[in-house]
């Protein structure tokens, strides 16, 4: 067994080059993020409607979310005081700037941001520092999520010109990922990532070439700023062999999400975890999200209803997305994800990665980390 090198992000060193991907609503909170960080990986808390369990969420969701950002980080730190812990914050969410600033003030090590290009992320971080009386000893790290060399070039160029900085880390999320995907339906089809038998149809070599192209773009900006900018790949990474394949492509680490759902420490309900275990290959489908992006999820009565053209009643609007028309959206993304998080697997949206059907049991974070790193091989 070859020992994996740590993931080095400037002055932040992650012992094992495994980032646990952010999953919302309520799937990766303090328990999962803290457990992953405790085992030497990087734990990521999803900020998406993070305050959904707060008693005032429906009447004062902004304060409920801000309060929960602080609390979840505090609780994760109690689990892993020296661990690497951060937030995943979606660009498409309303009040994005507020979530970013609160994550900085809460003491996050990193913000990973996608579902749109995080053009203004550096400015919001600087605004947070300006409001803080005591600055942290180590600056927070900023990591955009990209899906192509083109999007990597755009965000690097914009941060360079606008803020005179480069990313600290770049996450390349491929077409096998779960949840919201940075691809059009046509692009997913071109990669063979939208079928009922993705393992047989997916063109891995084609996306491997794209990963290498992203690495090349990032290297150019690393050279300009005189430092190495690590690239982490995500999407469909389930085994140690998958991890090694990504590292052989030139990645510095991997981001894994789906594999951690069926662990004891995952913050999801038992019913949510069981839905993964019960799912077959043919149950994992592509759907269109109100966010305006395709998403990968488990087919259930809720999605069957949507596919059949029936629109669930939307009782209230949580103002969760920057661009959302309650009159035309197929369903409320907040309520669909909250139902799922609470265990209503018939009426909720069960986001998952392409390998969710491979889950067979409830495991532990420690075992999953050891399998991914090859320690159990």
Predicted regions and their residues:
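Active-site entrance/lid segments in N-terminal catalytic domains of soluble metabolic enzymes
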Residues: 1-224
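Conserved active-site-proximal phosphate/metal-binding subdomains
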Residues: 19, 177-232, 238-377
